[in-house]
Protein backbone atom coordinates (compact mmCIF):
# COMPACT_ATOMS: atom_id res chain seq x y z
CA UNK A 1 0.00 0.00 0.00
CA UNK A 2 2.85 2.37 0.87
CA UNK A 3 4.32 1.84 -2.60
CA UNK A 4 0.99 2.75 -4.19
CA UNK A 5 0.76 6.03 -2.23
CA UNK A 6 4.37 6.93 -3.07
CA UNK A 7 3.68 6.22 -6.73
CA UNK A 8 0.66 8.53 -6.77
CA UNK A 9 2.61 11.34 -5.06
CA UNK A 10 5.48 11.05 -7.52
CA UNK A 11 3.10 11.21 -10.46
CA UNK A 12 1.33 14.26 -9.02
CA UNK A 13 4.71 15.98 -8.65
CA UNK A 14 5.48 15.18 -12.28
CA UNK A 15 2.37 16.91 -13.60
CA UNK A 16 2.58 20.00 -11.36
CA UNK A 17 4.68 22.11 -13.82
CA UNK A 18 1.80 22.35 -16.30
CA UNK A 19 -0.16 24.62 -14.02
CA UNK A 20 2.05 27.59 -14.85
CA UNK A 21 -0.14 27.91 -17.96
CA UNK A 22 -3.74 26.86 -18.35
CA UNK A 23 -3.57 25.05 -21.68
CA UNK A 24 -7.27 25.89 -22.05
CA UNK A 25 -8.49 29.43 -22.64
CA UNK A 26 -11.50 31.39 -23.84
CA UNK A 27 -11.77 35.00 -24.94
CA UNK A 28 -15.06 36.86 -25.20
CA UNK A 29 -15.62 39.99 -27.27
CA UNK A 30 -16.62 42.78 -24.91
CA UNK A 31 -20.00 43.31 -26.60
CA UNK A 32 -20.85 39.65 -26.19
CA UNK A 33 -19.54 39.51 -22.64
CA UNK A 34 -21.78 42.40 -21.55
CA UNK A 35 -24.95 40.74 -22.87
CA UNK A 36 -25.99 37.61 -20.98
CA UNK A 37 -28.10 36.21 -23.82
CA UNK A 38 -25.27 36.64 -26.32
CA UNK A 39 -22.73 35.13 -23.95
CA UNK A 40 -24.98 32.15 -23.26
CA UNK A 41 -25.33 31.58 -27.01
CA UNK A 42 -21.56 31.50 -27.38
CA UNK A 43 -21.07 29.27 -24.36
CA UNK A 44 -23.63 26.82 -25.72
CA UNK A 45 -21.68 26.62 -28.97
CA UNK A 46 -18.38 26.12 -27.13
CA UNK A 47 -19.94 23.43 -24.92
CA UNK A 48 -21.07 21.56 -28.02
CA UNK A 49 -17.48 21.52 -29.32
CA UNK A 50 -15.55 20.38 -26.26
CA UNK A 51 -15.80 17.75 -23.55
CA UNK A 52 -14.12 20.08 -21.05
CA UNK A 53 -15.84 22.28 -18.49
CA UNK A 54 -15.81 25.91 -19.63
CA UNK A 55 -15.43 26.93 -16.00
CA UNK A 56 -11.95 25.35 -16.08
CA UNK A 57 -10.77 27.71 -18.83
CA UNK A 58 -8.72 30.83 -18.27
CA UNK A 59 -10.89 33.63 -19.63
CA UNK A 60 -10.40 37.20 -20.79
CA UNK A 61 -12.56 39.90 -22.35
CA UNK A 62 -11.25 41.36 -25.61
CA UNK A 63 -11.93 45.09 -25.86
CA UNK A 64 -12.33 47.31 -28.88
CA UNK A 65 -9.20 49.22 -27.88
CA UNK A 66 -7.15 46.01 -28.01
CA UNK A 67 -8.48 45.14 -31.46
CA UNK A 68 -7.93 48.69 -32.73
CA UNK A 69 -4.38 48.81 -31.40
CA UNK A 70 -3.46 45.94 -33.70
CA UNK A 71 -5.67 46.44 -36.73
CA UNK A 72 -6.69 50.07 -37.25
CA UNK A 73 -3.57 51.05 -39.21
CA UNK A 74 -3.92 47.92 -41.34
CA UNK A 75 -7.63 47.73 -42.07
CA UNK A 76 -8.48 51.40 -41.68
CA UNK A 77 -11.40 50.33 -39.53
CA UNK A 78 -12.12 51.59 -36.05
CA UNK A 79 -14.26 49.37 -33.82
CA UNK A 80 -16.39 50.74 -31.00
CA UNK A 81 -17.12 48.91 -27.76
CA UNK A 82 -20.48 47.70 -29.11
CA UNK A 83 -18.92 45.99 -32.16
CA UNK A 84 -16.70 43.31 -30.63
CA UNK A 85 -18.74 40.12 -30.84
CA UNK A 86 -16.32 37.36 -31.85
CA UNK A 87 -15.17 34.82 -29.27
CA UNK A 88 -12.50 32.12 -29.34
CA UNK A 89 -11.67 28.94 -27.45
CA UNK A 90 -8.22 27.31 -27.49
CA UNK A 91 -7.34 23.89 -26.10
CA UNK A 92 -3.69 22.86 -26.22
CA UNK A 93 -4.35 19.28 -25.16
CA UNK A 94 -5.20 18.50 -28.79
CA UNK A 95 -2.12 16.61 -29.99
CA UNK A 96 -2.71 16.10 -33.71
CA UNK A 97 -1.32 19.34 -35.08
CA UNK A 98 -3.85 22.12 -35.33
CA UNK A 99 -7.61 21.92 -35.78
CA UNK A 100 -9.73 25.03 -36.33
CA UNK A 101 -13.52 25.04 -36.18
CA UNK A 102 -15.26 28.18 -37.44
CA UNK A 103 -18.97 28.70 -36.84
CA UNK A 104 -19.98 29.27 -40.44
CA UNK A 105 -23.49 30.27 -39.41
CA UNK A 106 -22.03 33.38 -37.78
CA UNK A 107 -18.50 33.96 -39.17
CA UNK A 108 -19.14 34.83 -42.81
CA UNK A 109 -15.82 36.01 -44.27
CA UNK A 110 -12.79 34.44 -42.60
CA UNK A 111 -12.39 30.67 -43.02
CA UNK A 112 -10.54 28.10 -40.93
CA UNK A 113 -7.76 27.98 -43.54
CA UNK A 114 -7.32 31.75 -43.28
CA UNK A 115 -7.04 31.54 -39.50
CA UNK A 116 -4.57 28.66 -39.89
CA UNK A 117 -2.37 30.82 -42.12
CA UNK A 118 -2.43 33.72 -39.67
CA UNK A 119 -1.66 31.42 -36.75
CA UNK A 120 1.23 29.80 -38.61
CA UNK A 121 2.64 33.29 -39.15
CA UNK A 122 2.38 33.70 -35.38
CA UNK A 123 4.40 30.55 -34.73
CA UNK A 124 1.32 28.45 -33.97
CA UNK A 125 0.74 25.05 -35.55
CA UNK A 126 -0.67 23.20 -32.54
CA UNK A 127 -3.95 23.21 -30.68
CA UNK A 128 -7.71 23.04 -31.06
CA UNK A 129 -9.37 26.36 -31.92
CA UNK A 130 -13.07 27.25 -32.03
CA UNK A 131 -14.28 30.64 -33.29
CA UNK A 132 -17.86 31.87 -33.05
CA UNK A 133 -20.02 34.94 -32.43
CA UNK A 134 -23.60 35.50 -31.27
CA UNK A 135 -24.43 37.50 -34.41
CA UNK A 136 -23.23 37.58 -38.00
CA UNK A 137 -19.61 38.75 -38.14
CA UNK A 138 -16.78 38.91 -40.66
CA UNK A 139 -14.38 37.23 -38.24
CA UNK A 140 -11.51 39.59 -39.05
CA UNK A 141 -11.46 41.13 -35.57
CA UNK A 142 -11.68 37.64 -34.05
CA UNK A 143 -7.99 37.03 -34.75
CA UNK A 144 -7.10 39.30 -31.82
CA UNK A 145 -9.13 37.04 -29.55
CA UNK A 146 -7.65 33.86 -30.98
CA UNK A 147 -4.11 35.14 -30.44
CA UNK A 148 -5.01 36.32 -26.93
CA UNK A 149 -6.47 32.89 -26.17
CA UNK A 150 -3.17 31.31 -27.17
CA UNK A 151 -1.26 33.72 -24.96
CA UNK A 152 -3.47 32.74 -22.01
CA UNK A 153 -3.22 29.03 -22.76
CA UNK A 154 0.55 29.12 -23.29
CA UNK A 155 1.40 31.61 -20.57
CA UNK A 156 3.58 33.73 -22.86
CA UNK A 157 3.12 36.85 -24.98
CA UNK A 158 3.14 36.98 -28.76
CA UNK A 159 5.17 40.04 -29.83
CA UNK A 160 3.02 42.95 -31.04
CA UNK A 161 4.84 43.17 -34.38
CA UNK A 162 4.00 39.51 -35.00
CA UNK A 163 0.32 40.13 -34.21
CA UNK A 164 0.26 43.05 -36.62
CA UNK A 165 1.91 41.02 -39.38
CA UNK A 166 -0.60 38.19 -38.89
CA UNK A 167 -3.48 40.68 -38.91
CA UNK A 168 -2.19 42.27 -42.11
CA UNK A 169 -1.93 38.87 -43.73
CA UNK A 170 -5.49 37.90 -42.76
CA UNK A 171 -6.89 41.22 -43.92
CA UNK A 172 -5.03 40.96 -47.23
CA UNK A 173 -6.45 37.47 -47.77
CA UNK A 174 -10.01 38.68 -47.27
CA UNK A 175 -9.42 41.69 -49.53
CA UNK A 176 -7.95 39.58 -52.34
CA UNK A 177 -10.78 37.05 -52.06
CA UNK A 178 -13.32 39.86 -52.30
CA UNK A 179 -11.57 41.63 -55.18
CA UNK A 180 -11.01 38.52 -57.29
CA UNK A 181 -14.29 36.78 -56.52
CA UNK A 182 -12.34 33.61 -55.80
CA UNK A 183 -13.32 31.10 -53.14
CA UNK A 184 -11.73 32.32 -49.87
CA UNK A 185 -10.14 28.92 -49.25
CA UNK A 186 -8.52 29.02 -52.68
CA UNK A 187 -6.94 32.35 -51.78
CA UNK A 188 -5.88 30.82 -48.47
CA UNK A 189 -4.22 28.00 -50.43
CA UNK A 190 -2.35 30.60 -52.47
CA UNK A 191 -1.05 32.29 -49.33
CA UNK A 192 -0.11 28.97 -47.75
CA UNK A 193 1.87 27.80 -50.77
CA UNK A 194 3.65 31.13 -51.16
CA UNK A 195 4.54 31.19 -47.46
CA UNK A 196 5.84 27.64 -47.55
CA UNK A 197 8.07 28.45 -50.51
CA UNK A 198 9.26 31.70 -48.95
CA UNK A 199 10.12 29.84 -45.75
CA UNK A 200 11.84 27.07 -47.69
CA UNK A 201 14.04 29.62 -49.45
CA UNK A 202 14.28 31.86 -46.37
CA UNK A 203 13.07 34.88 -48.34
CA UNK A 204 12.15 38.24 -46.83
CA UNK A 205 12.46 40.48 -49.89
CA UNK A 206 9.01 41.43 -51.29
CA UNK A 207 10.40 41.52 -54.84
CA UNK A 208 11.57 37.91 -54.63
CA UNK A 209 8.36 36.79 -52.96
CA UNK A 210 6.29 38.55 -55.62
CA UNK A 211 7.78 36.26 -58.28
CA UNK A 212 6.60 33.27 -56.26
CA UNK A 213 3.15 34.82 -55.85
CA UNK A 214 2.77 35.27 -59.61
CA UNK A 215 3.93 31.73 -60.41
CA UNK A 216 1.75 29.99 -57.82
CA UNK A 217 -1.28 32.14 -58.68
CA UNK A 218 -0.90 31.06 -62.31
CA UNK A 219 -0.73 27.40 -61.26
CA UNK A 220 -3.94 27.85 -59.26
CA UNK A 221 -5.66 29.73 -62.11
CA UNK A 222 -6.01 32.85 -59.99
CA UNK A 223 -5.79 36.07 -61.99
CA UNK A 224 -4.08 38.83 -60.03
CA UNK A 225 -3.29 42.39 -60.95
CA UNK A 226 0.28 43.55 -60.42
CA UNK A 227 -0.90 45.59 -57.44
CA UNK A 228 -2.59 42.56 -55.88
CA UNK A 229 0.51 40.40 -56.35
CA UNK A 230 2.56 43.14 -54.70
CA UNK A 231 0.08 43.42 -51.83
CA UNK A 232 0.34 39.68 -51.15
CA UNK A 233 4.13 39.75 -51.41
CA UNK A 234 4.36 42.66 -48.97
CA UNK A 235 2.11 40.93 -46.42
CA UNK A 236 4.05 37.67 -46.57
CA UNK A 237 7.40 39.49 -46.48
CA UNK A 238 6.31 41.28 -43.31
CA UNK A 239 5.37 37.94 -41.79
CA UNK A 240 8.73 36.44 -42.76
CA UNK A 241 10.63 39.36 -41.27
CA UNK A 242 9.18 38.91 -37.77
CA UNK A 243 9.66 35.15 -37.45
CA UNK A 244 12.90 35.62 -35.54
CA UNK A 245 10.98 37.33 -32.73
CA UNK A 246 8.92 34.21 -32.03
CA UNK A 247 11.61 32.00 -30.51
CA UNK A 248 10.55 32.42 -26.87
CA UNK A 249 6.83 32.01 -27.56
CA UNK A 250 7.30 28.93 -29.76
CA UNK A 251 9.51 27.30 -27.13
CA UNK A 252 6.90 27.90 -24.44
CA UNK A 253 4.16 26.56 -26.76
CA UNK A 254 6.17 23.40 -27.40
CA UNK A 255 6.85 23.00 -23.69
CA UNK A 256 3.24 23.31 -22.59
CA UNK A 257 1.86 21.05 -25.34
CA UNK A 258 4.53 18.48 -24.50
CA UNK A 259 3.67 18.67 -20.80
CA UNK A 260 -0.04 18.32 -21.52
CA UNK A 261 0.58 15.26 -23.67
CA UNK A 262 2.76 13.75 -20.95
CA UNK A 263 0.13 14.65 -18.38
CA UNK A 264 -2.48 12.59 -20.23
CA UNK A 265 -0.34 9.48 -19.86
CA UNK A 266 0.48 10.23 -16.24
CA UNK A 267 -3.19 10.66 -15.35
CA UNK A 268 -3.84 7.21 -16.76
CA UNK A 269 -1.13 5.87 -14.45
CA UNK A 270 -2.68 7.69 -11.48
CA UNK A 271 -6.04 6.11 -12.23
CA UNK A 272 -4.35 2.71 -12.33
CA UNK A 273 -2.71 3.35 -8.95
CA UNK A 274 -6.03 4.50 -7.48
CA UNK A 275 -7.71 1.37 -8.78
CA UNK A 276 -4.97 -0.71 -7.17
CA UNK A 277 -5.48 1.15 -3.89
CA UNK A 278 -9.23 0.60 -4.09
CA UNK A 279 -8.76 -3.09 -4.79
CA UNK A 280 -6.30 -3.36 -1.88
CA UNK A 281 -8.69 -1.69 0.58
CA UNK A 282 -11.63 -3.73 -0.71
CA UNK A 283 -9.60 -6.87 -0.14
CA UNK A 284 -8.91 -5.87 3.49
CA UNK A 285 -12.59 -5.18 4.13
CA UNK A 286 -13.77 -8.45 2.63
CA UNK A 287 -10.93 -10.36 4.20
CA UNK A 288 -9.69 -11.65 0.84
Predicted regions, residues:
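Soluble oligomerization/assembly scaffold segments of membrane-associated complexes
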Residues: 120, 128-220
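C-terminal interaction module
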Residues: 187-288
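Sec-dependent N-terminal signal peptides of Gram-positive bacterial secreted proteins and lipoproteins
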Residues: 1-20, 274-277, 281
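Short, surface-exposed acidic
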Residues: 50-56, 126-129, 158-160, 206, ...
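N-terminal Sec/ER secretory leader and immediately downstream segment
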Residues: 21-122
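Short, charged low-complexity intrinsically disordered segments located at boundaries
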Residues: 72-73, 147-151, 172-183, 221-227, ...
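Hydrophobic, Leu/Ile/Phe/Ala-enriched alpha-helical segments that form helix-helix packing faces
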Residues: 13, 41-50, 118-119, 150, ...
Amino acid sequence: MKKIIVGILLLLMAISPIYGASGFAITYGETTNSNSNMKNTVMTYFNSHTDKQLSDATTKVITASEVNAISKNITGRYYSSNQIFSCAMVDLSYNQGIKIVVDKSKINVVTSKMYANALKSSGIEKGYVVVTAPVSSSGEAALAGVLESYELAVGADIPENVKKAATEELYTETQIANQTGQNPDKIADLFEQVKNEAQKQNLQDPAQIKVIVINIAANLNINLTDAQAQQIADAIANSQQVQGDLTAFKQQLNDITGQLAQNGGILDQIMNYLQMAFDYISGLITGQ
